[in-house]
């Protein structure tokens, strides 16, 4: 298993790699919300057509639809695992960040029940290993299609390497 996260309709989305063929990826969808009746597996989908998944540094799963994002060093892609296992480029780091040496270190899809932006914000952590500086990009998304609204991305500075995020209520 490469990655697993709770997502849409309370199902778990598990990215799996074939140990005998590292280019072969699958997405397993499981329903752990009920008693084990021997049929918790909801689906198995090929993700081998999702370009550069072998180079993924981070993943995020949606809770408003069946979204699966993965990030390489400078790009965020959406794996269309239910549509033949293809990928769609959703975001490329701005040229100035790439030229400065920043790389993607983390993805986090905001999934806090009852909050206004639930399922509508993708956070991207970026890190420059030379300067040891990190930034956080807040990216509004269309929660049903996965499109990232590039013209509305906000950048927050003043971090070190961001490896994980969580929401804390007051």
Predicted regions span which residues?
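Repeated scaffold domains used in trafficking and secretory/extracellular systems
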Residues: 1-9, 47-65, 98-114, 158-170
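Structural motif
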Residues: 11, 20-31, 73-80, 130-140
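Beta-propeller fold detector
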Residues: 37-54, 87-97, 147-158
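Structural hallmark of WD40 beta-propellers
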Residues: 10, 66-68, 119-120
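Short loop/turn segments that connect beta-strands within beta-propeller blades
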Residues: 32-36, 81-85, 140-144
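Blade-level signature of beta-propeller repeat domains, shared across WD40, Kelch, NHL, RCC1
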Residues: 132-170
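C-terminal structured domain segments
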Residues: 102-111, 118-148
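Residue position within the beta-strands of beta-propeller blades
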Residues: 13-14, 70, 123-124
